[in-house]
Amino acid sequence: MAPPPVPLRARMTAVAGALVLTPDTALMRLTKMQTNSRWYTAWGIVFYRGFGRLILLPPLWMVAKGASPREFARVARHLGWRHLCGGALLYTIQNVAFIVAANLTFIASVLAILATGPLMSCFAAKAFLGESVPRHTWIAAVVCAACVLVLFSDAFVERRDDDENTPATRDHLVGNFVALIVPAALALYWTACKSAKKDADMIPALALSGLIGGSLATLVVLGNVPFQRNENQNQNQNESVLSPLMPTPPADDGGVAIAALVTQTLSVAVAFALLTLGAKDVPSAEVSLIMLIELALGPLLVWAAVGEMPTWRVWLGAAGVLATMAAESFAAVADERREGSADFSSAAERETGGSGDAAA
């Protein structure tokens, strides 16, 4: 039978979620910690977004459901330990990788690599759930791989290390590699969600991921785990161990860093809530297309906020990924409609045949 029509409200809810998520990377760029290390700045953001998720999600869920803390605990137990802990771990991996990559390289590079997520989701579904992968998805994967190679080629171009809006060659390359973890971990996360019980709720897993991410960030910062050491950082011997967890004081930037940190923590939670609500009625291929709004607008907002201008290689690779994923999403939607039409025709023929037999 033909697929049911998608309610306009569901589409608008998904679009609203993508639009709310779009400023996330610009807010991340505006968030400055009291450290000169991009590495420790990233973990400071992981700390606040992790514990923010832990603090915000359970109350929001309970208010939306009109439930009690005991009911939230029951939902967590019903989800099962494997999906609760596995989902939390996978979400933590992609979240940490995204924040670290975004602080080491161009936002446009990270978002372009992240946009390949639907392709990886298809391959994960085939590997773990036995779902078929259409030919146009394989073609899109090859084209996107070529575009990502263009992004990586930019990392080997010499650039100045003294420009805070232009990542150094080493950071740029490492950031691109770390960004590859994000769509892979997300693909496994969505596969875990799909393999869970039909009446299961993944919100407890997201809340637990906040505890894992926040605790991990605390260990990295307090344990003084190094990755990169800028010259400015080495010169600043008075820098506190807790500096990565302390946003720039309002006296220095007018409160921009603190406002950006609070806003991004709230906006990401709201954005994924809206996207989840919309995805109940909107086909997954169409949701993937809607999510490309962030790739199209995110780099522009970062440029407007902090003046970060990627090179032409980054723009070329990002444009290639955007065009390829748009074509792939449209092809997937067309496949769903053709399958729906075929089912409708078969049902109509069976109904007509049954009516004829009855009349005879």
Residue ranges of model-derived segments:
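Helix-helix packing/entry segments at the starts of transmembrane helices
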Residues: 48, 108-118, 193-214, 264, ...
